[in-house]
Amino acid sequence: LNPLLLLADALVLLHWLVVLFVVLSPFAFACGALLDRRSAPARSKLARYLVRAKRSPRWRIAHLLTLAWIVVNTWLGKLCFLTIWEFALRDAAGQIVTEQGFIARWLAQALYIEAPWWAFVAAYSVFFALVLLTLWWAPPDWRARPRR
């Protein structure tokens, strides 16, 4: 196995983890806000985790900055650096960029959607606006201290 191809596949997986962080975090914030507004304390581990996620300024800021970076780069017409690195590693390994292993191919097919540039700009911008709204609707606890 070529180590460059393994790194390229690892980058596809990392890219997916970033996508999941960006897309699923607002749902965690919303669920945490709904659970936080109940009078009874959250009983399950998942419920407590969601409330902590909603309240966490660090998580909220990290999410907002990640999404802002994506939106700005999309507006500028730039590819994500993870995509650029993945393609460069595949090229350096002598692999055609579209030629990937089974798992990497399926992950990449779901990740790299064919659409016009303006569609990505619109989708990312609307999503960013919705995330900004969650800061008002379900604000984090800015006074919260990090857990140790």
Residues covered by each model-derived region:
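Hydrophobic alpha-helical membrane-insertion segments
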Residues: 62-87
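Physicochemical signature of membrane-embedded alpha-helices that form the seven-helix bundle of GPCRs
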Residues: 11-14, 62-65, 123
